[in-house]
Amino acid sequence: MRALRDRAGLLLCVLLLAALLEAALGLPVKKPRLRGPRPGSLTRLAEVSASPDPRPLKEEEEAPLLPRTHLQAEPHQHGCWTVTEPAAMTPGNATPPRTPEVTPLRLELQKLPGLANTTLSTPNPDTQASASPDPRPLREEEEARLLPRTHLQAELHQHGCWTVTEPAALTPGNATPPRTQEVTPLLLELQKLPELVHATLSTPNPDNQVTIKVVEDPQAEVSIDLLAEPSNPPPQDTLSWLPALWSFLWGDYKGEEKDRAPGEKGEEKEEDEDYPSEDIEGEDQEDKEEDEEEQALWFNGTTDNWDQGWLAPGDWVFKDSVSYDYEPQKEWSPWSPCSGNCSTGKQQRTRPCGYGCTATETRTCDLPSCPGTEDKDTLGLPSEEWKLLARNATDMHDQDVDSCEKWLNCKSDFLIKYLSQMLRDLPSCPCAYPLEAMDSPVSLQDEHQGRSFRWRDASGPRERLDIYQPTARFCLRSMLSGESSTLAAQHCCYDEDSRLLTRGKGAGMPNLISTDFSPKLHFKFDTTPWILCKGDWSRLHAVLPPNNGRACTDNPLEEEYLAQLQEAKEY
């Protein structure tokens, strides 16, 4: 009987301990049978509750309507957890998650890998977590499930339990902004997991796309346009001035040889006796060929006659004396027959200049005058006037003749006409130097002409301001355009204070030939007179006075100007 009492007491103690354990932990002693998963499927956590009133069936039916359910650990009235694994579903075809066997939550969670020492499962590293002490209404929870990518939220409810929600992928139509993150114990617990040591809980959405739109700089486009100018060809009569200017300055040197006296030829022969005749003939032949090529190059252009139209900026760079082609240049072909029957025509010759390249040279040929045009040439200039210009140009190089005075007193109707047209169409000099012109060409409005003109800086080392404009610090030169009626350009110079020099040795003069067209022709037409006059700017200014069309203040002052004038006379 005593053994029976001991056994009964032991049984009562076991029952008492089981009751106390059930009351203390709130864990089920018996596993209720629920609609379990299909045999052989993966075990999934479902809603688990130890309370006598389980979750309503209506809520379980609404859960499959979500495009992607949330992993939720939600305590109910008796401090229990509700865990739901995310199910990948499409709207309209959702299936309810499978419910595994009901077991104690703590034992099931500890069986998961990586959660031996934690109370939560390993979250998605792309999720975000936030916690708030206030409970959220059921309606707000349902709306949160409709987010395109909700945050991993752990919210404390009435009985101190947590609700854990995994991000759900929905359509972007019902997106709402994510809630602000807060530092909570849950975040600290998540960061302790080995898989999340180096992970960022606020990792941005990897599905985001970044579009980079390249916007072209308008300033770069302007710079390109500046290099491409001039885009419009000027009137045809602009280039028609050039042949007459060439003839005016240099003339035809053949007439000089015919006018020499027999004694002069004899003196040359005596001087040549000291050298072999073969060397002299070879040098004369080379000089003759160079003169013919140069004359044909300047007078007729590198590709065709001047009548072919405007030359592109790249064509304005004439041949350099230094050749960078290491292959020996081939000989020119014979000149082609003259293209005309009377008056003037054209001749061409060619030579290979490389693979697929042929250089062409053109020159004019003189033919008997056509009937009715004996007294006029193609430019409308009398033939006698051509001879007079040639004779004047020849006399300029005579040591016994004052070349400067000869040039200044040249009474040519053609030159007068050209100068008149040039001075009438050129823009007026700005009273102040535009500093932006040092970097790129500028456009300035000219009130007298009623349109804008392009100007470029002319203060570079090649301009040699220290020689030709010694008191100038800056210079400007107008650019040719489609509206230019001549090949001339306005030249303006300024002092150190960027003020226009209206007189004196530093003032600029209008240029007969613009450097935009040809720097070499500009030197021969505009710089050569300065050399012939031996730097006496006062004599040159008498023919081509510096421009002051905007009535700028006289610069330099009267006293300094008179001192410069006296210096020029004595020099």
Swiss-Prot record:
Expressed at high levels in the placenta and at moderate levels in the pancreas, kidney, heart, liver, lung, brain and skeletal muscle. One of its GO terms (cellular component) is extracellular region. Residues 327-371 form the TSP type-1 domain. It is found in: Secreted. The keyword Manganese does not apply. Residues 396-559 form the AMOP domain. Belongs to the isthmin family. This is Isthmin-2. The lineage of its organism: Eukaryota, Metazoa, Chordata, Craniata, Vertebrata.
